[in-house]
Amino acid sequence: MNIWEIATNYYQYFLRGTRTTILISLLTVFCGSILGCLIAFMRLSKFKPLEKFASIYITVIRGTPMLVQLYIVYYQLDFISYPTGTLFDVDLERALACIIALSINSSAYVAEIIRAGIQAVDKGQMEGARSCGMTNAQAMRYVVMPQAVKNILPAIGNEFVTMVKETSIIQYLGIGDLMYNNGIVVTSTYNPLPCYYISAIIYLALNIILGKGLNIFEGRLRKSER
């Protein structure tokens, strides 16, 4: 079978896998952004134990392979009781393990993105807000963060693009993402090369679409600064 025949005869597998890949990526970036925001503020904290914990957390997560983290989380969940079932036709136990592991991994990178975005804001902004009678929390909320967000959001968008590709490791837990379904088609056709070409094209198309969306978003952010 050639690439066109495989694409037309097995398109439902590729579509199903693409849906799962996008879903896991969205949930991962959402959860990772929330956790990353918390870690970033801990990293910026003047309370040394919190700052130290965040620093160690980021070092450990960024310094170990994502696949190892995925297996650790998956086997660790065996000791935790939680609801069983399915999430969009995906086994809930495995889906939770993937979302948790990928979110933890993403949070370490998001934390550094947020920290860098906040530190990129001129320190005079904070000092000016404080001189106007604002507390640290008020100055951060009303003065620093609105400016930092313009630096942070495009980078988090790039993290989403990266995560779409990195979710390919969840196939090792039997999650029906794009690469898992690609494997099913390879087994059925005994012709792996066209299958991998199709998967590569889908990943490329997803990232091009996301990249274009990010460019439009960044353009609007720049216009709002004028």
Model feature map: region roles:
Residues 1-226:
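Transmembrane alpha-helices and adjacent helix-loop boundaries
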